[in-house]
C-alpha cells in the first residue's frame, strides 16, 4: 500500500503507531561514555547525567520532635539534579585508571557543585617501570584502588539511584534503608572472575578527619556466580569512632546514618538529605553485614534481593553511657521486560528496629513501590512509580531521622515520575 501526503496527514493515529513501534523496537539502555581524547597511551572519557522529577505525594501523622504536626504536601517539580564524570585510562594496555565525578546539583547542595568520588585504580604495571617480577605477579591477580571512593558494601548500587545517575534503578525511589558512603582509603580487589573478593581500609568518614580518637574502618566482600545468571555476595563493614564526641562534632561513619546521594521523595517526613529514608544510628561503633542475590538471565525477568543487619554499639561517642542501636533490613525487587524499551518493576523493602537506646524495639518501616519505565531513546529514560510507606510498632517516645516521632505511625504515599538523560 502507498500513502500520499494527504493520506498521511489525515492519519495521525497511523503516525502515532509508527512512532511507538520504532521506539519500542529500537530503544534500549545505552552503556556509553563520550571519548574526548585518544592517544596510544592515554584515553579520556566524559559522562554526563541529569534528571528531572515530578511528584504528587501526601503524608499523614507526621510530627516533629516538639510534637508539632508537619503540614501536608503540594504536588510539584523537584530540583533538577546533575552529574559530571571523567575517566582517564593510561598506559598502552590501560594499566592505570583515574576517575572523578562531580555533583553539579544535588538534594544536599541544589545550587552548589561539589565532589563525589576521586580515585586511582591500578590494574597492571606501567611500561615505563619495566616489569618487576614481584609486582607483575601481584597485579596479574589483583587491582589496587586509592582515593575517595564508594565503599563497596552490598550490591544495591547496581539497583539504586545515585543523585542524577538513575538509569540502573528500575524505579524512582531507593531502598528504605539504603547503605551508601564515599570514604577515603585504599582497596585491594581480585580480577573480575566467576569468584572474587575485595578488602579495603578507610578513615571511616566521608572527608578527611584527623581528630584524636578517630577510628579506621575495614570492609570486605566476597562474591560468586554459581551459574552464569546468578550472583551472590556477602559484605562486612566495621569502624569504631567512640572516642570522639557525639553528633557531628565527632568523627562518624555515615554508611547508614547519612546519604549524600539523596532520596527521591522531596520534603516527605520532615525532608532532609534523604526524605523518607530510614537513617539509623550515629555512626560511632558500627558493625554491619549484608547478603545479596541477583538473577539476571536471558529471560525477561530480573530479580534482586538483600538482607542485612547493622548495629552501633555506642551512639554516645565519648560521652557517658553506651546506648546501642540495631536494625535488620531487607528488600526484594522484580523487573519484567516486555521489550528492550518497556518494562514493569516492583519492590518491597523494610527496616526492623531491634534496639533503640538500649531498649528492645518492635518498630518496623515498610515501603512498597511499583511502576515501570520507557526508553525514549538509548540515552533517555522515563519512569513512573507509585509508592506507599508506613511506620508501625514503635514505642511511645521513639523518634528517628530528623526528629520525626515514629511512634505516631507516620506515612506517605503517592506518585513520582522522572525523565533522565545520560551518556
Question: Where in the sequence are the language-model features?
Answer:
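Bacterial N-terminal signal peptides
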Residues: 16-25
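Short, glycine/charged-enriched secondary-structure capping and boundary segments
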Residues: 62-63, 159-162, 398-399
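Short, Lys/Arg-enriched N-terminal segments with co-localized hydrophobic residues
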Residues: 1-8, 31
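Outer-membrane beta-barrel pore domains
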Residues: 59, 69-71, 119-122, 232-240, ...
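Sec/Tat signal peptide C-region and signal peptidase I cleavage site
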Residues: 26-32
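Bacterial N-terminal signal peptides that target proteins for export
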Residues: 7-16
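Outer membrane beta-barrel
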Residues: 34-58, 71-207, 212-241, 330-341, ...
Amino acid at each position: 500500500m502507498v500513502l500520499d501526503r494527504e493520506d498521511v496527514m489525515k492519519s495521525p493515529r497511523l503516525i502515532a503507531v509508527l512512532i511507538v513501534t520504532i521506539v519500542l523496537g529500537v530503544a534500549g539502555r545505552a552503556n556509553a561514555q563520550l571519548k574526548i581524547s585518544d592517544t596510544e597511551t592515554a584515553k579520556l572519557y566524559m559522562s554526563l547525567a541529569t534528571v528531572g522529577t515530578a511528584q504528587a505525594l501526601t503524608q499523614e501523622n507526621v510530627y516533629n520532635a516538639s510534637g508539632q504536626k508537619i503540614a501536608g504536601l503540594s504536588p510539584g517539580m523537584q530540583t533538577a539534579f546533575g552529574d559530571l564524570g571523567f575517566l582517564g585510562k593510561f598506559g598502552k594496555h590501560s594499566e592505570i585508571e583515574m576517575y572523578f565525578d562531580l555533583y553539579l546539583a544535588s538534594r544536599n547542595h541544589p545550587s552548589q557543585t561539589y565532589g563525589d568520588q576521586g580515585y586511582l585504580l591500578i590494574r597492571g604495571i606501567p611500561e615505563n617501570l619495566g616489569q618487576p617480577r614481584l609486582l607483575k605477579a601481584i597485579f596479574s591477580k589483583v587491582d589496587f584502588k586509592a582515593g575517595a571512593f564508594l565503599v563497596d558494601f552490598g550490591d544495591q548500587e547496581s539497583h539504586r539511584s545515585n543523585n542524577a545517575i538513575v538509569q540502573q534503578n528500575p524505579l524512582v525511589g531507593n531502598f528504605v534503608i539504603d547503605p551508601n558512603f564515599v570514604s577515603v582509603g585504599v582497596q585491594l580487589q581480585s580480577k573480575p572472575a566467576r569468584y572474587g573478593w575485595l578488602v579495603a581500609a578507610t578513615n571511616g568518614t566521608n572527608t578527611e578527619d584527623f581528630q584524636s580518637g578517630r577510628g579506621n574502618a575495614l570492609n570486605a566482600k566476597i562474591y560468586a556466580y554459581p551459574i552464569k545468571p546468578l550472583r551472590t555476595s556477602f559484605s562486612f563493614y566495621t569502624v569504631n569512632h567512640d572516642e570522639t564526641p557525639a553528633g557531628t562534632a565527632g568523627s562518624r561513619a555515615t554508611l547508614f546514618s547519612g546519604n549524600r546521594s539523596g532520596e527521591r521523595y522531596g520534603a516527605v517526613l520532615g525532608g532532609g538529605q534523604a526524605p523518607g529514608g530510614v537513617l539509623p544510628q550515629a555512626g560511632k561503633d558500627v558493625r554491619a553485614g549484608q547478603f545479596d542475590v541477583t538473577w539476571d538471565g536471558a529471560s525477561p525477568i530480573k530479580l534482586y534481593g538483600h538482607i542485612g543487619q547493622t548495629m552501633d554499639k555506642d551512639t554516645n561517642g565519648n560521652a557517658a553511657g553506651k546506648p546501642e542501636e540495631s536494625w535488620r533490613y531487607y528488600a526484594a525487587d522484580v523487573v519484567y521486560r516486555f521489550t528492550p524499551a518497556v518494562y514493569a518493576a516492583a519492590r518491597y523493602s523494610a527496616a526492623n528496629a531491634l534496639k533503640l537506646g538500649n531498649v528492645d524495639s518492635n518498630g518496623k518501616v515498610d515501603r512498597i513501590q511499583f511502576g515501570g519505565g520507557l526508553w525514549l531513546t538509548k540515552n533517555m529514560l522515563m519512569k513512573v512509580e507509585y509508592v506507599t510507606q508506613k511506620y508501625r510498632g514503635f514505642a511511645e517516645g521513639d523518634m528517628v531521622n530528623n526528629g520525626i516521632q515514629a511512634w505516631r505511625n507516620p506515612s506517605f504515599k503517592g506518585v513520582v515520575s522522572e525523565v533522565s538523560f545520560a551518556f
